[in-house]
């Protein structure tokens, strides 16, 4: 069954979501597991010069399959261009928030079978990560010679995310800070 668009889970007002996140999985039956396979990739023990990260500029929810699509795009580009031992990549958010959907029937005579908005709590259909402005979603650590490849990889990954995002470069060493 196809997924509903993001507008079904967001408000039109300035607030992207209201209320606390719906996360208590011990009380929720049938929550599908997140599609994200790995949160940490590459070489975590390398000596890197820069952190390049994607951060969001608006408040909102990022579904688990959007995070997985961004992860796959970034990891594939980095592993083919600079190799697995030359970067450290991490997904910084976890999809804790459970999304629910009150499924409606869409065929002739459905109005006699379903209850409409009566008891419209909904069944769990997926999970999402709630993010706030300035919060980093994806992070790559690289050496100076691979900085442009990291920016391009994160640009490709950011295009998979449903929120407007930007890329920032943070130098880790003093000589990199002086050059920046």
Curated annotation (Swiss-Prot):
One of its GO terms (biological process) is translation. CDD domains: Ribosomal_L16_L10e (cd01433). InterPro entries: Ribosomal_uL16, Ribosomal_uL16_arc, Ribosomal_uL16_CS_euk_arc, Ribosomal_uL16_dom, Ribosomal_uL16_euk_arch, Ribosomal_uL16_sf. Keywords: Ribonucleoprotein, Ribosomal protein. Gene3D superfamilies: Ribosomal protein L10e/L16 (3.90.1170.10). The keyword Cell inner membrane does not apply. The keyword Zinc-finger does not apply. This is Large ribosomal subunit protein uL16. GO terms for molecular function: structural constituent of ribosome. SUPFAM superfamilies: Ribosomal protein L16p/L10e. GO terms for cellular component: ribonucleoprotein complex; ribosome. Disulfide bonds: none annotated. Belongs to the universal ribosomal protein uL16 family. It holds the Pfam family Ribosomal_L16.
